[in-house]
Amino acid sequence: LTYYTPDYQTKDTDILAAFRMTPQPGVPAEEAGAAVAAESSTGTWTTVWTDGLTSLDRYKGRCYDIEPVAGEENQYIAYVAYPLDLFEEGSVTNLFTSIVGNVFGFKALRALRLEDLRIPPAYSKTFIGPPHGIQVERDKLTKYGRPLLGCTIKPKLGLSAKNYGRAVYECLRGGLDFTKDDENVNSQPFMRWRDRFLSVAEALFKAQAETGEIKGHYLNATAGTCEEMMKRAIFARELGAPIVMHDYLTGGFTANTSLAYYCRDNGLLLHIHRAMHAVIDRQRNHGMHFRVLAKALRMSGGDHVHAGTVVGKLEGERDVTLGFVDLLRDDYIEKDRSRGVYFTQDWVSMPGVIPVASGGIHVWHMPALTEIFGDDSVLQFGGGTLGHPWGNAPGAVANRVALEACVQARNEGRDL
């Protein structure tokens, strides 16, 4: 039980974790909490003689508090503090390998979920963070005072590059700011990435010339190797595209951070899709909450990330969703358990990420979405644009008109 230290005073530089743990029957909570702290830091299953060659007091994780979860039988929140020295600077990969790498398969636990992490400024300052952030993006696009509008091109698979470009053009001409590759559009036999990039670029510039607005399409650079991913991002930049896209969980944090550095150095915005997140965050008592994945993404680098909708076809509770939306956008977020925020998080000067509301939303949801997400967001309507009975461009017009109306009503102080 050397890892259970209820009298420990946490330091400003400690990385703090809140685990929701369900011990096996007969295992005391303190023992389970100590086991989590040990296995995710310096411990192993037995005492080893080489422990004497280092200072465990300096390097060990400490379980410093355990509280039972109200209304749940045999479930606890265990708070663990990790010394900063345990982690490589600027590596989300290393952070996750340490904290969630091994401990989730632990025999003494029936289930374990990482609910939240407190990242101290001493650590967060070693990360690149979003390549550009919210303000720089608005300046690049010269679009202010309203949410941005996007649309995922459907059917997501099976279109030829030529027809894909046509769909993009229709949407952008109608008034959307962005269109998007679906997360699983990479480079398949029916549409190789280069053909898609070329026909999309043509559509972009045509729509820009017609509307006088800057347009973007999230060109998905996700690939089977980092080298191939960079090749696609470089080609997108050469075409003059303003934004590329990456699936950060399937692509991996290492690839994601490499891409973020490239995007910052070359003036590309980076849109992040969270494909595979529900595998990790859907279970209520095992895995990892999305707010942890959102914090990790803000450090690893991305200018947009999908963040649920509160009103569409995918799961998400309003307060909890708003909790991690604030964690993405704001500099300083107060601890608030009702919104699932277990720790006060101070991002200091790290730029914010724009949350993207996407998944089963349509024009009818517009008042709710403008109210819930506010101006710094991207509202993404896939079927909600392309499903318009008159076609893509009228669908885009409908969305833009609805958005402008809601923003005007809000600015006049009317209740949405």
Curated annotation (Swiss-Prot):
Its cofactor is Mg(2+). Its main location: plastid. Transmembrane segments: none annotated. The keyword Ribonucleoprotein does not apply. Its EC number is 4.1.1.39. Mg(2+) binds at K180, D182, E183. It is found in: Plastid, Chloroplast. The disulfide bond which can form in the large chain dimeric partners within the hexadecamer appears to be associated with oxidative stress and protein turnover. Binds 1 Mg(2+) ion per subunit. Keywords: Calvin cycle, Carbon dioxide fixation, Chloroplast, Disulfide bond, Lyase, Magnesium, Metal-binding, Monooxygenase, Oxidoreductase, Photorespiration, Photosynthesis, Plastid. PROSITE patterns: RUBISCO_LARGE. InterPro entries: RuBisCO, RuBisCo_large_chain_AS, RuBisCO_lsu_C, RuBisCO_lsu_C_sf, RuBisCO_lsu_fd_N, RuBisCO_lsu_N_sf. Substrate binds at N102, T152, K156, R274, H306, S358. The record marks K313 as: Transition state stabilizer. It catalyses: 2 (2R)-3-phosphoglycerate + 2 H(+) = D-ribulose 1,5-bisphosphate + CO2 + H2O; D-ribulose 1,5-bisphosphate + O2 = 2-phosphoglycolate + (2R)-3-phosphoglycerate + 2 H(+). One of its GO terms (biological process) is photorespiration. The active site is at K154 (proton acceptor), H273 (proton acceptor). One of its GO terms (cellular component) is chloroplast. It is an enzyme of class 4 (lyase). One of its GO terms (molecular function) is magnesium ion binding. The modification N6-carboxylysine is found at K180. RuBisCO catalyzes two reactions: the carboxylation of D-ribulose 1,5-bisphosphate, the primary event in carbon dioxide fixation, as well as the oxidative fragmentation of the pentose substrate in the photorespiration process. Both reactions occur simultaneously and in competition at the same active site. The basic functional RuBisCO is composed of a large chain homodimer in a 'head-to-tail' conformation. In form I RuBisCO this homodimer is arranged in a barrel-like tetramer with the small subunits forming a tetrameric 'cap' on each end of the 'barrel'. Belongs to the RuBisCO large chain family. Type I subfamily. Heterohexadecamer of 8 large chains and 8 small chains; disulfide-linked. The disulfide link is formed within the large subunit homodimers. This is Ribulose bisphosphate carboxylase large chain.
